[in-house]
């Protein structure tokens, strides 16, 4: 069995699309019919995230922590208890490609760190073009990158348990896990092959996360970003 884990805090705008994409990835023909479950960890949600996630086909678990490390760990625990041999992680504002899970497994590694793409920068209004240019100029979207994104991460259950899983960190829980995997000697594929598209939202949910990095880029002087994109 395979598992896909998604943490969510008040994500009613994005969760249906995120779960639908994850469900499609779990049904990909290259998986040979192996069962796949999608679990959404509802973290202090006060909106319709849970209803929408279940309607799209996910199982939900609940916690009141406002902590992404806790939420990821809870979703992973539910999948481990269900018998998942591989844990794939993404985010509630992210749509994985139909072959995303199959591509993770095809890399034949203990863990997979993937890249992210953005297909809509319009939420940044007049800054959209400048931010997009900065992303294209500075983001390394190729094999052997060293990005760590909770939105595009996979690990064998055996190695996940060996290193103790996600710590209950409010940010950088994904970085902490990958560093633990590196120390354990795990075979990690730093690959651009498994694809996801994430949002460029204006309100960062975690310090040090992808949205936070975008906001820091916006705070840089326009000339600095323009020079980087030249």
Regions found by a protein language model. Give the residues of each.
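Short, well-formed alpha-helical segments that are part of the catalytic scaffolds
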Residues: 11-28
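Short beta-strand/loop segment that forms part of the nucleotide-sugar
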Residues: 30-44, 61-63
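A conserved acidic beta->alpha catalytic loop
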Residues: 39-51, 94
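Acidic donor-binding/catalytic loop of UDP-sugar-dependent glycosyltransferases
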Residues: 48, 90-106
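Conserved donor nucleotide-binding strand/loop of the catalytic core
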Residues: 50-82
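Conserved donor NDP-sugar-binding/catalytic core segment of glycosyltransferases
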Residues: 99-126
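Short, flexible, basic/aromatic active-site loop/helix in glycosyltransferases
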Residues: 114-115, 127-146, 218
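Acidic donor-binding loop at a coil-to-helix junction in glycosyltransferase catalytic cores
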Residues: 171-177
């Amino acid at each position: 069995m395979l598992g896909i884990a998604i943490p969510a805090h008040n994500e009613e705008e994005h969760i249906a699309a995120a779960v639908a994409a994850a469900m499609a990835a779990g049904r990909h023909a290259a998986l040979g019919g192996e069962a796949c479950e999608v679990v959404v960890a509802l973290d202090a949600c006060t909106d319709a995230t849970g209803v929408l996630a279940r309607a799209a086909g996910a199982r939900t678990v609940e916690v009141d922590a406002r902590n992404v490390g806790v939420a990821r760990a809870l979703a992973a625990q539910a999948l481990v208890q269900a018998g998942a041999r591989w844990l794939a992680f993404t985010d509630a504002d992210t749509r994985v490609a139909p072959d995303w899970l199959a591509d993770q497994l095809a890399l034949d590694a203990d863990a997979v760190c993937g890249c992210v793409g953005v297909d809509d920068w319009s939420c940044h209004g007049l800054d959209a073009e400048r931010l997009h240019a900065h992303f294209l100029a500075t983001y390394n979207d190729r094999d052997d990158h060293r990005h760590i994104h909770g939105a595009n991460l996979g690990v064998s259950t055996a190695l996940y348990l060996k290193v103790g899983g996600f710590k209950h960190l409010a940010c950088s829980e994904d970085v902490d896990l990958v560093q633990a995997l590196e120390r354990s000697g795990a075979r990690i594929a730093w690959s651009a092959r498994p694809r996801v598209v994430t949002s460029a939202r204006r309100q960062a949910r975690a310090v040090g996360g992808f949205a936070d990095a975008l906001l820091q880029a916006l705070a840089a002087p326009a000339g600095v970003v323009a020079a980087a994109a030249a």
